[in-house]
Amino acid sequence: MERLNKKVQPVVRLEHARKAFGGNRVLNDISLSVMPGEVVAIIGPSGGGKSTLLRCMTLLERLDGGGLWYGGFPAGEDGELAVARPAGGEPGGKAVYGDKGVLAQARQRFGLVFQNFNLFPHMSVMRNIMDAPLVVQKRDRAEVERQARALVQKMGLAGCEDKVPCQLSGGQQQRASIARALAMNPQVLYFDEPTSALDPELTGEVLKVLKQLAAEDTTMIVVTHEMAFARDVADRVVFMDGGVIVEEGAAEQVMDAPVHERTREFLSRFSG
């Protein structure tokens, strides 16, 4: 925990979030704040709401109720950008979203790495990395290219610059996806089960990259089934089940001495 930046303002803050699909309540009164430099691992059984939580925080889905704020902005209350506010200021009230400009600002503050890579299949590794900084951020091409080449080296992809995704291994594709997300200089990186589509050997490649990013104080929120990663790399672990946060706390506490019976039951399935 010594790594954590002691700034008061969270990078992202979610309050009393609610989300349902039809009659199925997927998120039920979820509140979560993540500080600069913090690594948060979200664990739990399939169908517990983990991926929906990430999709709502990254604006791929809209909350039904509650609020979502991103920090680090020059305007707004306490330097936060209100992406969604609860109607009437009531906790858990209907989520009222900002306009397109607000959502566009928020999207530039985070990167998202999917479990299935989601690289553009017709683009080379370099073009995949450079596309969003050039098109969305309108940055200088020479600067973007320098950054992309540095990220290729950092991700261990030297020699793959001109390859398209089908010419890469799964681990290489996921590392290219991480490089693409980093190219936008995000304040926080989201990972949705980044190793679930990989075999064990390639999983190790990607986890090594995540450990490196954590050591560099990269703010990360990681939905994962990799319990060793949650224990050894995360600062905080959140255990979700049934659309609620059952338990959260320091990684070593939740993983090695969980308080709730449901957490203990879940983790026992991963013990040797």
Describe every region a protein language model picked out.
Residues 242, 248, 252-272:
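C-terminal boundary and immediately downstream tail of ABC-type ATPase nucleotide-binding domains
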Residues 7-251:
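ABC family nucleotide-binding domain
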Residues 1-4:
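A short, compositionally biased domain-edge/stem linker segment
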